[in-house]
Curated annotation (Swiss-Prot):
<dbReference type="GO" id="GO:0006412">
    <property type="term" value="P:translation"/>
</dbReference>
<comment type="function">
    <text>Binds as a heterodimer with protein bS6 to the central domain of the 16S rRNA, where it helps stabilize the platform of the 30S subunit.</text>
</comment>
<keyword id="KW-0694">RNA-binding</keyword>
<keyword id="KW-0699">rRNA-binding</keyword>
<dbReference type="GO" id="GO:0070181">
    <property type="term" value="F:small ribosomal subunit rRNA binding"/>
</dbReference>
<protein>
    <recommendedName>
        <fullName>Small ribosomal subunit protein bS18</fullName>
    </recommendedName>
</protein>
<keyword id="KW-0687">Ribonucleoprotein</keyword>
<dbReference type="InterPro" id="IPR001648">
    <property type="entry name" value="Ribosomal_bS18"/>
</dbReference>
<comment type="subunit">
    <text>Part of the 30S ribosomal subunit. Forms a tight heterodimer with protein bS6.</text>
</comment>
<dbReference type="GO" id="GO:0022627">
    <property type="term" value="C:cytosolic small ribosomal subunit"/>
</dbReference>
<dbReference type="InterPro" id="IPR018275">
    <property type="entry name" value="Ribosomal_bS18_CS"/>
</dbReference>
<keyword id="KW-0689">Ribosomal protein</keyword>
<dbReference type="Pfam" id="PF01084">
    <property type="entry name" value="Ribosomal_S18"/>
</dbReference>
<dbReference type="InterPro" id="IPR036870">
    <property type="entry name" value="Ribosomal_bS18_sf"/>
</dbReference>
<dbReference type="GO" id="GO:0003735">
    <property type="term" value="F:structural constituent of ribosome"/>
</dbReference>
<comment type="similarity">
    <text>Belongs to the bacterial ribosomal protein bS18 family.</text>
</comment>
Amino acid sequence: MARYFRRRKFCRFTAEGVSEIDYKDVVTLKNYITESGKIVPSRITGTCAKYQRQLARAIKRARYLSLLPYTDLHK
């Protein structure tokens, strides 16, 4: 009986000691959105609730200012 152990998820922002997530940091924000432009949930990324809220707010601001696309699937 082989048991599969998942690697424990951790909040990258807490580990790095980030005080606030910046909406201008597009490279970091792109890691937390899917190919279709949706925000990846914290149960997938392991981000804690405090930083997930900041992340969502930063992504929405970046979209509004056209730093990030709303979707990548424009035809």
